[in-house]
Amino acid sequence: MANAASGMAVDDECKLKFLELKAKRTYRFIIYKIDEKKKMVVVEKVGEPVLNYDDFAASLPANECRYAIFDYDFVTEENCQKSKIFFIAWSPDTSRVRSKMIYASSKDRFKRELDGIQVELQATDPTEVGLDVIRGRAN
């Protein structure tokens, strides 16, 4: 079903990969992009569980918008192992205005398709999605 505001549908693979990340911890991260020709949000890349934050950050293009899911593992002050699922709306200042508008207008509907997001971040440059920011928002 297409999103009335932006006309973007969501590929079934987007939900399937997210469920695998959430339930089976099959991936560390998922990068999604909008395929303007297909008018659809699609999976661009998945990161294996052995990958880390630096691998994730390197997967975000410098000049193009993306949506991303990052499964962040951490240890609490009480020494408990936890994880939080982050949704990141990546919209760099250097990306095209049209692209920013399409991603912004499609974001809420896309997020509703992914049940289990715990923290949302909006980022326009790498510092806004740095590991220190993720660590701070996870607690």
Swiss-Prot record:
Alphabetically, the GO molecular function entries are: actin filament binding
What InterPro entries is this protein classified in? ADF-H (IPR002108), ADF-H/Gelsolin-like_dom_sf (IPR029006), ADF/Cofilin (IPR017904)
Q: Which Gene3D superfamilies match?
A: Severin
One GO BP annotation here?
Answer: actin filament depolymerization
Identify the GO cellular component terms for this protein: actin cytoskeleton; cytoplasm
Keywords in UniProt for this one? Actin-binding
Q: Coiled-coil region(s) at which residues?
A: none
UniProt entry tagged with the keyword Methyltransferase: no
Listed PROSITE patterns: ADF_H (PS51263)
The ADF-H domain covers 7-139
CDD domains in UniProt: ADF_cofilin_like
Give the similarity note: Belongs to the actin-binding proteins ADF family.
What the protein does comes down to:
Actin-depolymerizing protein. Severs actin filaments (F-actin) and binds to actin monomers.
What's this protein's name? Answer: Actin-depolymerizing factor 7
Native species: Oryza sativa subsp. japonica (Rice)
Give the organism's phylogenetic lineage: Eukaryota, Viridiplantae, Streptophyta, Embryophyta, Tracheophyta
